[in-house]
Amino acid sequence: MATSANLDIGAQLIVEECPSSYISGMPDIKLEHQLDPNPDEGAAQGVAMGMKFILPNRFDMNVCSRFVKSLNEEDSKNIQDQVNSDLEVASVLFKAECNIHTSPSPGIQVRHVYTPSTTKHFSPIKQSTTLTNKHRGNEVSTTPLLANSLSAHQLAAQGEMLYLATRIEQENVINHTDEEGFTPLMWAAAHGQIAVVEFLLQNGADPQLLGKGRESALSLACSKGYTDIVKMLLDCGVDVNEYDWNGGTPLLYAVHGNHVKCVKMLLENGADPTIETDSGYNSMDLAVALGYRGVQQAIESHLLKLLQNIRE
């Protein structure tokens, strides 16, 4: 099983433990020094295109390479199962649990650890007990008393439109961020609340805002395959190649989640399939390594169209 000590992949994101998930013009990255860093989220701002930072605790993409090379070996089945398990635990999308103390590179800001759940669907966003119960089906109904005690972010995640609208009108918290820099829009996008996302966008929510780890509403939606939300965000003109703290782009997250429709939509809207991780792997490499034939075919088809357009 892969450990957090060899986490080395250029894409990671996203959503199930809720907040308390590129570039065509890469913005400046500020690297903050910390005197007493904790062995947390595994590292700082990701990179894209020509710029590279050495980030500790990142998933080694050689695992993907080993997976591909093993397909023709006699014991490929056992190796494939092991590597699939490695990819699930130390995946592109999720900040892995880290129990090993490392020495971060100078200038790299280290954040606290997000502990993954025992399922394959977990994320860096911490969920409250209320949200956890909702997903487990333990919550029968939401009483006015309970709804009034929830934050705007939790209301957005649960789809409590009426209470959320009232809260925003009274307190003007439509772009308010929690301790991780997540906005109500990001919470709604992460939980597939289509109506809430539409409501927030229509009432002034900023889809361009990023979390402390550069997480975006688009990446959060792509990681779960919420195509309707992805389309709404793309229609707002968000950066389709935005990268997060781990170098992950919306396309890489959609590829990792095997969300073919999202992959096609992103490619049609200018997502760059050639953006590579620090280890030199792009979205096609990841699709092949994970055995996602549908995603692979979607990328191949897009690249062929690009080549045909160039020839014409």
UniProtKB/Swiss-Prot annotation:
Record GO biological process: regulation of protein-containing complex assembly
Pfam family, one: Ank_2
Entry's Gene Ontology cellular component terms: 3M complex; cytoplasm; cytoskeleton; cytosol; membrane; nucleus
UniProt subcellular location: Cytoplasm, Cytoskeleton; Membrane
Top-rank taxon, per record: Eukaryota
ANK repeats: 147-179, 180-212, 213-245, 246-278, 279-312
Keyword list, A-Z: ANK repeat, Cytoplasm, Cytoskeleton, Membrane, Repeat
GO terms, molecular function: histone deacetylase binding; low-density lipoprotein particle receptor binding; protein kinase binding; ubiquitin protein ligase binding
Entries under InterPro entries matching the protein: Ankyrin_rpt, Ankyrin_rpt-contain_sf
Membrane-topology annotation of the record: Peripheral membrane protein
Domain notes: The ankyrin repeats, mainly ANK 2, ANK 3 and ANK 4, mediate interaction with a wide array of PxLPxI/L motif-containing proteins including HDAC4 and LRP2. The PxLPxI/L motif of interactors can contain a Ser or a Thr residue in position 2, which phosphorylation prevents the interaction with ANKRA2.
Function: May regulate the interaction between the 3M complex and the histone deacetylases HDAC4 and HDAC5. May also regulate LRP2/megalin.
Self-association and partners: Interacts (via ANK repeats) with CCDC8 (via PxLPxI/L motif); mediates the interaction with the 3M complex which is composed of CCDC8, CUL7 and OBSL1. Interacts (via ANK repeats) with HDAC4 (via PxLPxI/L motif). Interacts (via ANK repeats) with HDAC5 (via PxLPxI/L motif). Interacts (via ANK repeats) with LRP2/megalin (via PxLPxI/L motif). Interacts (via ANK repeats) with RFX7 (via PxLPxI/L motif). Interacts with AHRR. Interacts with NEK6.
PANTHER family for the chain: ANKYRIN REPEAT FAMILY A, ANKYRIN REPEAT FAMILY A PROTEIN 2
Name of this chain's protein: Ankyrin repeat family A protein 2
Source organism: Mus musculus
Gene that specifies this protein: Ankra2
